[in-house]
């Protein structure tokens, strides 16, 4: 059953401080838009985020595709923009290894993801140890609250993430109510009758295009929100093909918010 509760109501009862903060932020900014900023230079990355910042609740990064990455040059100004525009950060790392390995991938190396990203995500393919490893890494490296999304479903054509795989991933999520805050999925993932209130974030959302020729399949904002999506993830629809990120940011923010108001009967 799709939740018709408001973000504020959900914030008041959610066990995760990360989810609480995100719900309050979305309500304050009247925005449930996550900008997926996949570009290869720090300057373009920061410039786009600065333009999109007023319209988003979350920025989604693939930090390892930035050619000139440095912590001081890329992450420090990203955190400044997050404070300036009041949005949270989601590193789309898609962890998929044993617990000890993902712990080090999350906390160490060049990127030190746990030190700056509010939210990250993981596949369920290696079992529940991936959750334990990431949670341990967060607790050992930062005093800031962190949250994890499990990859239950994907938007790409031919994805193997469906059926029993999705069901098993949901079972893994149930093992940690505070650290696992929700899913990357195409619809509501249930759990309400067991006391879970998972945040559903959905990629592959577009107001104009139906696909990209490389397997991506787009669904409309109204379509995904009406079936349980809480946060719409949009990338090239905001800045690709000569689009103006400020114009498109406002357009998608308004579309997402209006769909949320419709779902919650406001």
From Swiss-Prot:
Its EC number is 4.1.1.23. GO terms for biological process: 'de novo' pyrimidine nucleobase biosynthetic process; 'de novo' UMP biosynthetic process. Substrate binds at residues 38, 60-62, 92-101, 218, 236. GO terms for molecular function: orotidine-5'-phosphate decarboxylase activity. Keywords: Decarboxylase, Lyase, Pyrimidine biosynthesis. The active site is at residue 94. Pathway: Pyrimidine metabolism; UMP biosynthesis via de novo pathway; UMP from orotate: step 2/2. It catalyses: orotidine 5'-phosphate + H(+) = UMP + CO2. Belongs to the OMP decarboxylase family. PANTHER family: OROTIDINE 5'-PHOSPHATE DECARBOXYLASE. This is Orotidine 5'-phosphate decarboxylase. It comes from Candida maltosa (Yeast).
